[in-house]
């Protein structure tokens, strides 16, 4: 089995360990990119690869693979594959091993255009992401591999029963929570038994004054809305499996959107905008219209789906089957083996 070094450089991947996923450190959890990083490192280790992750971990020996300070990275160490994760790290340019850049962002530190020629392979996380690289940075050799679902986290939630017309919002608040607030009064009027749980806020990335601002805006609807904010992973899973729909009038050009992928895995039917990669990650209903100027489309489609529960049950079943094939860890490990390591 090839040995794999994963080198980080800046931003959200720094510090995180497998313990971070479950809120066992000082963070409430982690974002989708970090979740993918740790899940894949863990899975590669289970396959028999020797994995070293250089990301300045908050705690040593907190993951089933080795984690080290970035300063410990030696370009001349023997390795089969070097993965630059997220953003370019100049330490890697003349390092030993096959060079792969696993990008999960379109804007971060470093010169993408100048860095790309040093890479043997470039992995993007959606076609939208790869198209952006080509258009903005002139990077034409990138290919796409989905982010996997961390399947083991769903095992205890498999037999949960959803609550009729329960909506869930699990993404970053400023990517569409205010747009959902703008249509919620209409949804409440048309669907009297509707309810909503919000399970995300900025505490995933540390304290932020924006947390309370979003919570306050929903106060008048607290009879039907639970604004729980960032939750420990297990509690988040419980809320996800109680939901019927994820109405996400997103206004941010998502590069993948783990929130929508996890919702589909759990059988929560997504109704989203077509922003960024949502047009491919979402296998439910996509509304190709700006949520800021087309509120009625989002209202009407949500009401239509909620008012036909038999059809919704069928939509959820078909979508979940597709999600469990597409986002399975086994399939994505095979893609990495075929497209990258071979």
Protein language model features and the residues they cover:
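Extended catalytic core of nucleotide-activated donor transferases of GT-like folds
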Residues: 52-120, 124-131
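Conserved donor-binding/catalytic core segment of Leloir-type glycosyltransferases
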Residues: 158-176, 181, 197
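Nucleotide-activated donor-binding/catalytic signature segment of Leloir-type glycosyltransferases, i.e.
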Residues: 210-237
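Acidic donor-binding loop of glycosyltransferase active sites
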Residues: 241-255
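Short hydrophobic beta-strand element within catalytic cores of glycosyltransferases
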Residues: 269-272
């Amino acid at each position: 089995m090839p040995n794999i070094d994963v080198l980080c450089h800046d931003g959200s991947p720094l510090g995180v360990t497998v313990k971070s996923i479950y809120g066992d450190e000082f963070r409430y959890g982690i974002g989708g990119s970090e979740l993918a990083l740790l899940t894949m490192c863990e899975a590669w280790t289970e396959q028999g690869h020797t994995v070293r992750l250089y990301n300045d971990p908050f705690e040593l020996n907190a993951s089933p693979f080795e984690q080290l300070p970035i300063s410990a990275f030696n370009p001349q160490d023997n390795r089969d594959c070097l993965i630059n994760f997220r953003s370019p790290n100049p330490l890697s340019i003349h390092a030993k091993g096959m060079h792969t850049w696993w990008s999960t962002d379109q804007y971060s530190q470093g010169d993408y255009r100048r860095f790309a020629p040093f890479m043997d392979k470039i992995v993007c996380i959606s076609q939208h992401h790869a198209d952006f690289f080509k258009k903005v940075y002139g990077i034409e050799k990138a290919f796409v591999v989905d982010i996997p679902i961390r399947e083991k986290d769903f095992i205890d939630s498999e037999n949960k029963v959803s609550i009729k017309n329960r909506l869930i919002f699990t993404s970053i608040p400023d990517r569409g929570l205010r747009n959902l607030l703008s249509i919620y009064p209409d949804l409440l009027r048309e669907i009297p038994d509707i309810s909503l749980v919000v399970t995300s806020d900025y505490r995933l990335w540390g304290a932020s004054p924006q947390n309370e601002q979003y919570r306050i805006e929903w106060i008048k609807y607290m009879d039907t809305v639970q604004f729980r904010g960032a939750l420990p992973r297990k509690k988040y899973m419980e809320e996800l499996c109680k939901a019927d729909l994820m109405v996400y009038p997103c206004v941010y050009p998502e590069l993948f959107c783990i929130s929508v992928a996890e919702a589909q895995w759990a059988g929560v039917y997504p109704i989203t905008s077509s922003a960024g990669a949502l047009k491919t990650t979402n296998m439910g209903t996509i509304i190709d219209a700006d949520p800021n100027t087309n509120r009625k489309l989002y209202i009407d489609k949500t009401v239509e789906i909620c008012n036909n529960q038999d059809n919704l049950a069928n939509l959820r079943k078909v979508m979940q089957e597709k999600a469990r094939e597409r986002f399975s860890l086994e399939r994505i490990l095979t893609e990495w083996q075929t497209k990258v390591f071979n």
